[in-house]
Amino acid sequence: MAAFTLALPATARAGHDDNGTDPDNRNQAIKGFSLTANGTKAMNHGKAELERSVITTSWGGGDIEVYDKDYGSNGWHGYADCTDWNALWTSCDIIRVRFNTHWSLTASQWRSLGCHEFGHTADLGHRKKSNDTDNNSCMREEVWPTHYDQHDLNAIKAGT
């Protein structure tokens, strides 16, 4: 008996890929759904950070959908995932961003969280201390910078 394995096609991705939210293009329409003031703050800052890259954004819907609520003590402050892959499973048509209001965060931490989760919508993965030695990337998990560093911006340019 022969066994067959189905493999998804390989795709080019950013330098520190998140393996799951490769945007379908460089023009992303963003829509928030019944956000709290903190969720709105995070979304607005995340959108502004994307604008620093090769990705242009607009308000509307169809590309990035943003939600926030108390998701409980589940270990995450924010989460980004693809809810609608294109027909070939090579890029994401709709990316969902969720902010967890369960945690008490400062205004600066909400901005950092927005930057971080919107970084995932640009196909950025998490950074580690070993490749962010000056602690200035919002893609780090252990610290709370509020901006992408040049490495992040270069990775977005290369991967989208």
Regions found by a protein language model. Name each.
Residues 1-13:
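Secretory targeting and sorting signals
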Residues 11-160:
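Zinc-dependent metalloendopeptidases
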